[in-house]
Amino acid sequence: MAQYLAPHELDPYAKGKVKDGKLTAPMFDVVFIQALSTEPIDAKSIPTWKKYLKSEVAEVKAAGSEPVVVVTWAKKDHPEDTKKLADSIISAANENGAAALPVGLAFAEAHAGRPDINFYAPDKRHPSAAGSYLYGAVAYSFLFHRSPEGLKFLGGCDKPLSEADAAYLQSVAWKTVRAFYGW
C-alpha cells in the first residue's frame, strides 16, 4: 500500500499525515481495499494477495482507520466466479478483522433482475457507468447504514442514468447491504 500513498505526501490534505509512503496519523474514517479483478481466486495470485491484504489491513488499522475489503464482481463472461470471489474475499476480510463491501454480490443481483442494464465496460471486467453507480450506492449504504433510495444524483458520466435505472440500482444496493449485514 505504501507505494500508492507515497504521491500523497505532497497533497495539502496529507501534510504531516503521510511519511515515506505510510500513514502516520488518522486521515480517513474508512479505507477501501480492492484486489485486482480475479486475483482472489487465481491459484497463483492468492498467496501474494493474502500477504499484501494482511499488511494493508494492519497498516490501515495502525493509522486509525477502518479497513473495508471490496468484494469484487465477476468478469462479464464468467458470472460463475461471483460466489468464488465472494467466498475468498469475505473469508480473507474476516481473517484480518476487516469489513467487507458486497459490491460483486450487488452486481449479480442487479444483473439477474435487469439483464438489460450493461454493468461492464467494453473490456468486460471494469464497471460501466451503471456498474460504477451501483458500486457507489453499495458504498453509500454501507457507510451511512441507510438506503440510497430517493437520492437524485444520476451519475457523473457523459450520459446520466435514467431515473428508473438509478432507482433500481439504489434499491438493489440497499437490499444487498441489508441482507449481507443482517440489518
Task: Annotate each language-model stretch with its function.
Residues 1-3, 29-34, 66-71, 99-102:
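Structural recognition of the beta-strand scaffold that forms the well-ordered cores
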Residues 47-53, 82-86:
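Charged helix-capping and loop-helix junction motifs
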Residues 1-49:
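Conserved SGNH/GDSL esterase-like catalytic core that processes O-acyl groups on lipids
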Residues 37-46, 72-79, 118-127:
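Second-shell loop/turn segments in exported
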Residues 126, 137-183:
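Conserved catalytic region of serine esterases and O-acyltransferases that act on ester linkages
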Residues 60-87, 103-114:
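Active-site segments of SGNH/GDSL-like serine hydrolases
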Residues 19-26, 55-63:
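Acidic (Asp/Glu)-rich catalytic clusters
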Residues 87-118, 137-149:
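Extracellular serine-dependent O-acyl
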